Amino acid sequence: MLGFVGRVAATSASGALRGLGPSPLPQVKVLLRASPAALQSARDYATQTSPSPKAGAATGRIVAVIGAVVDVQFDEGLPPILNALEVQGRETRLVLEVAQHLGESTVRTIAMDGTEGLVRGQKVLDSGAPIKIPVGPETLGRIMNVIGEPIDERGPIKTKQFAAIHAEAPEFVEMSVEQEILVTGIKVVDLLAPYAKGGKIGLFGGAGVGKTVLIMELINNVAKAHGGYSVFAGVGERTREGNDLYHEMIESGVINLKDATSKVALVYGQMNEPPGARARVALTGLTVAEYFRDQEGQDVLLFIDNIFRFTQAGSEVSALLGRIPSAVGYQPTLATDMGTMQERITTTKKGSITSVQAIYVPADDLTDPAPATTFAHLDATTVLSRAIAELGIYPAVDPLDSTSRIMDPNIVGNEHYDVARGVQKILQDYKSLQDIIAILGMDELSEEDKLTVSRARKIQRFLSQPFQVAEVFTGHMGKLVPLKETIKGFQQILAGEYDHLPEQAFYMVGPIEEAVAKADKLAEEHSATQTSPSPKGAAAXXXRVV
């Protein structure tokens, strides 16, 4: 049976190739002519009631269906590469994207949804443009799929603005060359691995270490501190996680179902979707973010979870199109596909898109082509550590593994740089002393090393912070700490100004003043228990003496 299917596929492919004529060169010319027409600038926003095909658009018919690949024949008006086609006579909307030209009249397309029920001879209409999706403030608080359809059961997205998902990166003259920190209000991030406005951040973390909570806090803080919007693109991840994230955002107030104060737009193409949808959903999310940057001058936060799935889907599409695979089975256009998307994530003179990308590393192999290609584009890495999460320190960001390209005295200033490096040095010294402490105990350390350990433990606890989106779980009121307060607090701990305070005073507080207030409160509670011990406490003390 498999052999028969293989022969049918091979016959279909060879039949298509026969249409190319004696030389494949004309096909290359067609591709090169078609591409610029299909790529439309993200700054050209069409105003229309819906992205319906144009009147009098070219009509074709399906001639072959091989899984997610559909071949469509046009008698005239061959659609350019990347154009969106719509299959007629179906209850649900099925969009096909032109990927290749086979001969003079046939195009090979990738389906954006399941191809179940398709038959040869079915009519297909050319939309005359790439896939267009709704953009604008009306998308906030809503969930859409790769082709811009709402999937949150809350009716249509009422916007007149539509934009093509394929666009050129901003021109050099439009880009801003100023390096600027995006202050997140999260102490450990702002101090040790600051995010650059318009930068790309890789978020590494396993299950249960707080990736989702960190993402939600970043969305919340950017909305409150900068008035900015966020876009979350779920690329090839679990549907359950996407559903959980949506409901957690409603509970924490990031999404408001009652009015128009939502601060985030969600775009989902989960792992049950065909490869075409997973390969394009990141571009759909990016297009929504580009509107807020270019038309409203916003500093937008774009979350992509997971960028590896974008590459994985591209690999599947490439194999379906019959391209010869490159290293480790990835598509030969891996670097091009990644670069085309990543170059659109940048700062312009109007606004910025700062991207936080969760990265799955296959088999923990950082040399795998997929993560290795992503690393080339990253400006900062935020590593979430299970060992730190086990200590109860949240956010569980590893202060020694997390890095940032803008951690440079010329960008962040000498004071910030010196404090950050001082914090990392003392934490590294503490890490190297832990083996000695485990074997010989604290008493065997020199006075200088004891002081290092004491300050490092205070710094470690001061790197924790109560999150506003986690108030309902922790009972601690969330804190957003300005960068100046963060630098001042760590500077004073390093200088030894708080050597007299107990280390538990530094746990789960905002600025340093709260640690001092907490220490005073702990001292009062301690003195109160000393002066008036309870009868049970006195009895227990007597029992211990005996």
Swiss-Prot record:
Superkingdom of this protein's organism: Eukaryota
The protein's role, per its UniProt record: Catalytic subunit beta, of the mitochondrial membrane ATP synthase complex (F(1)F(0) ATP synthase or Complex V) that produces ATP from ADP in the presence of a proton gradient across the membrane which is generated by electron transport complexes of the respiratory chain. ATP synthase complex consist of a soluble F(1) head domain - the catalytic core - and a membrane F(1) domain - the membrane proton channel. These two domains are linked by a central stalk rotating inside the F(1) region and a stationary peripheral stalk.
Bilayer topology: Peripheral membrane protein
The reaction(s) this protein catalyses: ATP + H2O + 4 H(+)(in) = ADP + phosphate + 5 H(+)(out)
Region (Disordered): 521-546
GO biological process: angiogenesis; cellular response to interleukin-7; lipid metabolic process; negative regulation of cell adhesion involved in substrate-bound cell migration; positive regulation of blood vessel endothelial cell migration; proton motive force-driven ATP synthesis; proton motive force-driven mitochondrial ATP synthesis; proton transmembrane transport
Gene Ontology CC terms: cell surface; mitochondrial inner membrane; mitochondrial membrane; mitochondrial nucleoid; mitochondrion; plasma membrane; proton-transporting ATP synthase complex
NCBIfam families in the record: atpD
Protein name, as recorded: ATP synthase F(1) complex catalytic subunit beta, mitochondrial
Organism: Canis lupus familiaris
Modified residues (N6-succinyllysine): 123, 132, 160, 258, 263, 521
Modified residues (Phosphoserine): 432
Known EC number: 7.1.2.2
Binding annotation for ADP: 208-213
Family under the similarity heading: Belongs to the ATPase alpha/beta chains family.
Residues modified as N6-acetyllysine: 123, 132, 160, 197, 258, 263, 425, 479, 484, 521
PANTHER family reported for this sequence: ATP SYNTHASE, ATP SYNTHASE SUBUNIT BETA, MITOCHONDRIAL
Coarse class of the protein's main subcellular location: mitochondrion
Annotated ATP binding sites: 208, 210-213, 238
